[in-house]
């Protein structure tokens, strides 16, 4: 989609790169059942002809960091939902994107797994120094994962509100964020913005 006005530039002010380093993760893992987890997470590298020793070492480290090293030769049907989402994220991170676009990446998971996986993924993305834009309909998830929440209007979608999130916590995990003293305030603000539309 072209912008109505202006241009969109991501880490490329002179326009010299052919493609921006953007990773995209859908709400469903879309792992191929006929490929092993290892073959699934290296698929992007394979397509881009980038299966270098350095990239393979990076994938091996990600598999270890995400607790999937022992499962890399398994098929997706042998993994839990949370493990499959971790594999999908590794596939996204394997190409070393600077910007991650996550479209409801945890919505297919049960609540407990969703909390654990979102916490793991958020911490790993922060540790890697990546920027994440996440689409979610879960207010608690938005508050606990984001530095800034954008509320969109009904169709056609426009930015209705921008709410910076500042939680006073030592532990910045999404699970701990739900216990921050400011959390109820932000939840109420977002809820009011959303109920204004109905």
Describe each region flagged by the PLM.
Residues 3-18:
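Conserved ABC transporter NBD signature motif
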Residues 100-103:
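Catalytic Walker B motif of ABC-type/P-loop ATPase nucleotide-binding domains
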Residues 75-79, 83:
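Conserved ABC ATPase signature
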Residues 89:
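Hydrophobic anchor residue at the start of the ABC signature
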Residues 27-34, 138:
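Catalytic "switch" loops of ABC-type ATPases
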Residues 38-46, 56, 164:
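Short helical segment in ABC ATPase nucleotide-binding domains corresponding to the A-loop/adjacent helical element
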Residues 94-98:
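A short, proline-enriched helix->beta-strand linker immediately N-terminal to the Walker B motif
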